[in-house]
Curated annotation (Swiss-Prot):
It comes from the Bacteria. The lineage of its organism: Bacteria, Pseudomonadati, Pseudomonadota, Gammaproteobacteria, Pseudomonadales. Signal peptide: none annotated. Pfam families: DUF188 (PF02639). It comes from Pseudomonas paraeruginosa (strain DSM 24068 / PA7) (Pseudomonas aeruginosa (strain PA7)). This is UPF0178 protein PSPA7_5991. InterPro entries: UPF0178. Belongs to the UPF0178 family.
Length: 160
C-alpha cells in the first residue's frame, strides 16, 4: 500500500501530516506534481515532477495508483477516476470520496464552477486552518487503518 499526494494542490500542513502517519505506519509516500516542490526530508517520501501539461499529474496518479492505495487530492474529477479504479481518495480537509457520494460531489463541483463563471460566486475555498488539519488527521487515521486491515485480509486469502 502506498500513499499518493496530488502535491500541487495539497496544503503544506496536510503533506506534513501524511509524512508523519507514513513514518509511523512504515508506508511509502509519493508526491506527484506538475511543478518543482520541496521534498520533505524523509526516506519514505518520493517526489515525481511530471512534464507540464493539462492534467499530467492527474493522469500519472491514475496510471500509477493501484487498488488499495490512497490518494490525497482536492480535485473531484481526479477522485472520480481513482474511485472507479478502486483507489481510495481523501481530500486534505478530511472528506473521503467514495462511489456513493461521487455523483453528488461532481454535480456540486460543476454547479460551483458554473456559478463562478457567471460571476455569481467568488473563487476558492477558505484558508486551510486548524479544524481542517484535525479533520484530515482523524480521517487519514481511520482510512489508513481500514486500508491496512483490508490489505492484510487480501494477503491472507489463498490464491485461486
Amino acid at each position: 500500500m502506498r500513499i499518493w499526494i496530488d502535491a500541487d494542490a495539497c496544503p503544506k500542513a496536510a503533506k506534513e501530516l501524511v509524512c508523519k502517519f507514513a513514518l509511523k505506519r512504515k508506508l511509502e509516500v509519493w508526491m506527484v506534481a506538475g511543478q518543482p516542490q520541496v521534498k520533505p526530508p524523509f526516506a519514505c517520501v518520493r517526489l515525481v515532477v511530471v512534464e507540464s501539461g493539462m492534467d499530467a499529474a492527474d493522469d500519472y496518479l491514475v496510471e500509477q495508483a493501484e487498488p488499495g492505495d490512497l490518494v490525497i487530492c482536492s480535485d473531484v474529477p481526479l477522485a472520480d477516476r481513482l474511485i472507479k479504479k478502486q483507489v481510495a481518495a481523501l481530500d486534505p480537509r478530511g472528506r473521503e470520496f467514495d462511489a456513493r457520494n461521487m455523483g453528488d460531489k461532481l454535480a456540486m463541483r460543476n454547479l460551483m464552477a458554473d456559478l463562478r463563471d457567471l460571476g455569481q460566486m467568488g473563487g476558492g475555498q477558505a484558508p486551510y486552518g486548524d479544524r481542517d488539519r484535525q479533520a484530515f488527521a482523524n480521517a487519514l487515521d481511520r482510512l489508513l487503518t481500514r486500508l491496512q486491515r483490508e490489505a492484510g485480509l487480501r494477503a491472507n486469502q489463498p490464491h485461486k
